[in-house]
Amino acid sequence: AFGTGLHESTGMCLKLLSRTDVNGRTVLDVGCGSGILGIAALRLGAEKCDFIDIDPLAAEAAKANLDCNGMTAEVFCGDLAETYRGHADIILANLTADILLRLKDDLPRVMKRGGVLIMSGIIDARAREIEDAFFGDGFAKADMLAENGWRAYAAVKQ
């Protein structure tokens, strides 16, 4: 499962997460992979973090990593729209531009107004496409990081 913490997109998500007040908040790690981002959110003080991935191996990896860290959380395996019924204050989505664009309508549905979307896995060549799709249409850009050809964004749901 993706998420060792060594990739630029993961590192930038962690930086944006560290700049976000997670204390007492509900977090959702979408496309959780190894669970590194959600585990970091819990370590930073999130009240609750749910994890979801369409890959059963990733969901199992996230469960194993939660266990290794002495944490418990709900881990869902399936499509976001069909599987998840919660509402998060913060969504972590380190995916790809194509997957983010596919989830554009689903992410706001599982997010509280004023919530923060942290998304990465976006190559520079696709940044404008992501910005056009998300910002001004339900989200306001709050922060952006760029590193070695990759982008990460923090956005607030309007």
Predicted regions and their residues:
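Short alpha-helix immediately C-terminal to the canonical SAM-binding loop
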Residues: 59-60, 100, 127
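Conserved class I S-adenosyl-L-methionine
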Residues: 124-137
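ADP-ribose/adenylate-binding Rossmann-like module
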Residues: 114-127
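Hydrophobic beta-strand segment of the Class I
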Residues: 90-93
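Core SAM-dependent methyltransferase catalytic element
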Residues: 140-158
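Conserved SAM/SAH cofactor-binding pocket of Class I
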Residues: 4-84
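A short glycine-rich, Lys/Arg-flanked "PGG" loop and its adjoining helix->strand segment in the class I
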Residues: 101-116
